[in-house]
From Swiss-Prot:
<keyword id="KW-0479">Metal-binding</keyword>
<feature type="binding site">
    <location>
        <begin position="213"/>
        <end position="216"/>
    </location>
    <ligand>
        <name>GTP</name>
    </ligand>
</feature>
<feature type="compositionally biased region" description="Acidic residues">
    <location>
        <begin position="360"/>
        <end position="374"/>
    </location>
</feature>
<dbReference type="Pfam" id="PF01018">
    <property type="entry name" value="GTP1_OBG"/>
</dbReference>
<dbReference type="InterPro" id="IPR031167">
    <property type="entry name" value="G_OBG"/>
</dbReference>
<keyword id="KW-0342">GTP-binding</keyword>
<dbReference type="InterPro" id="IPR006074">
    <property type="entry name" value="GTP1-OBG_CS"/>
</dbReference>
<feature type="binding site">
    <location>
        <begin position="283"/>
        <end position="286"/>
    </location>
    <ligand>
        <name>GTP</name>
    </ligand>
</feature>
<feature type="binding site">
    <location>
        <begin position="314"/>
        <end position="316"/>
    </location>
    <ligand>
        <name>GTP</name>
    </ligand>
</feature>
<dbReference type="GO" id="GO:0003924">
    <property type="term" value="F:GTPase activity"/>
</dbReference>
<keyword id="KW-0963">Cytoplasm</keyword>
<dbReference type="Pfam" id="PF01926">
    <property type="entry name" value="MMR_HSR1"/>
</dbReference>
<comment type="function">
    <text>An essential GTPase which binds GTP, GDP and possibly (p)ppGpp with moderate affinity, with high nucleotide exchange rates and a fairly low GTP hydrolysis rate. Plays a role in control of the cell cycle, stress response, ribosome biogenesis and in those bacteria that undergo differentiation, in morphogenesis control.</text>
</comment>
<dbReference type="GO" id="GO:0005525">
    <property type="term" value="F:GTP binding"/>
</dbReference>
<dbReference type="GO" id="GO:0042254">
    <property type="term" value="P:ribosome biogenesis"/>
</dbReference>
<feature type="domain" description="Obg">
    <location>
        <begin position="1"/>
        <end position="159"/>
    </location>
</feature>
<keyword id="KW-0378">Hydrolase</keyword>
């Protein structure tokens, strides 16, 4: 299944039913008066968050949604049946924007959360409503009100406690495989990861946190190089970032310079994300002898003047991973909550959302999305 995280849809609520024009006609009651009932309301449209969904791919095949219209009123003061409400299932973590005004309508963060996005049309009054002392036999009625219509842009942002950052082949996917049950693709070439992966890291029987792995960044990503910053938005809800770096890159590059380059890309994309707590994780310690690996680790930390926590690990062998996981678990309760994306101003320019969406939907990433990861 392809991973789709932005779509456009059109929604319309149901129109209200028309009121009825009717008069009571029974034996021995020749002038029974008006008894036309009101029309029923139309159906409203709701978005409902569902935890079993993890992509917006279904909306690529159906873009238009309409709720049922209300039924017309009838004689004997009978009100028309209301139209059925329409509930559209979306993944937990979906942001809903008005596509015309770019206004944020809601953020569906919790299982079962409902958001009204198109209110139903009101049912029209029947002629009974217009009866008065001066109008004993009214023949006027009211048509049902029109339902609301709007174009929406749905944007999925994954829910995770911790996010992984790093260059391609830094070992992010290997780390998430080592500490969770997630099984992202791992291979010895750049951009093996083409879409985000989530893994649940279980520390104890009832203690766990969620780790997010996104495709690797490269210098120039904020300007579209590589896979660009398309997936950085999925780290917007995290409380802690782990900056993974290969301590012995095959291209001979300086690990400290690689980290500085990505720090600049992160700041260019979102100052809010760049200011988030970030730990340094130096990976692939198994490639060097023990003392040499420790010396290289200290050299990198010194060159960066790194003051936050730093860890030396080997995701391939598992060395140091347990200590890293335990430190994260201890730190998470004291970390501030992630910035509310509904209040954040710097997560990319919403004015060019249409262009970004068209470019994204034109891509053909034939990658299987791991449904069983979380």
């Amino acid at each position: 299944m392809k991973f789709i995280d932005e779509v456009r849809i059109h929604v319309a609520s149901g129109n209200g039913g028309h009121g009825a024009v009717s008069f009571r006609r029974e034996k021995f009651i020749p002038f029974g008066g008006p008894d036309g009932g009101d029309g029923g309301r139309g159906g409203s449209v709701y978005l409902v968050a569902q935890a079993s969904l993890n992509t917006l791919i279904d909306f690529r095949y159906q873009r238009r949604y309409r709720a049922e219209n209300g039924h017309g009123g009838a004689g004997r003061q009978m009100t028309g049946r209301a139209g059925h409400d329409l509930e559209i299932k979306v993944p937990v973590g979906t942001l809903v924007y008005d596509d015309d005004t770019h206004e944020l309508l809601g953020d569906l963060r919790f299982e079962g959360e409902r958001l009204l996005i198109a209110r139903s049309g009101r049912g029209g009054h029947g002629n009974l409503f217009y009866k008065s002392s001066t109008n004993r036999a009214p023949r006027q009625f009211e048509k049902g009100g029109a339902g609301e219509e709007r174009d929406l842009r749905l944007e999925l942002r994954l829910l995770a406690d911790v996010g992984l950052l790093g260059l391609p082949n830094a070992g992010k996917s290997t780390l998430i495989r080592a500490v969770s049950a997630a099984r992202p693709k791992v291979a010895d070439y750049p951009f093996t990861t083409l879409y985000p992966n989530l893994g649940v890291v279980r520390v104890a029987a009832h203690e766990s946190f969620v780790l997010a792995d996104i495709p690797g960044l490269i210098p120039g990503a904020s300007e579209g190089a590589g896979l660009g910053t398309r997936f950085l938005k999925h780290l917007s809800r995290t409380r802690l970032l782990l900056h993974l770096v290969d301590m012995a890159p095959v291209d001979g590059s300086d690990p400290a310079m690689n980290i500085r380059a990505l720090e600049m890309e992160l700041a260019a994309y979102s100052p809010t994300l760049a200011a988030r707590p970030r730990w340094l994780v130096v990976n692939k310690s198994d490639l060097l002898p023990g003392e040499e690996a420790e010396a290289r680790f200290q050299q990198i930390c010194t060159a960066l003047q790194w003051e936050s926590p730093a860890f030396l690990i080997s995701a391939a062998s598992g060395a140091g991973c347990e200590a890293l996981v335990y430190a994260i678990w201890q730190a998470l309760p004291d970390l501030p909550p992630a910035a509310d994306p509904t209040q954040t101003e710097d997560w990319g320019d919403e004015s060019d959302a249409g262009e970004r969406l068209e470019n994204w939907e034109g891509d053909d990433l034939d990658a299987d999305w791991e449904e069983e990861q979380v």
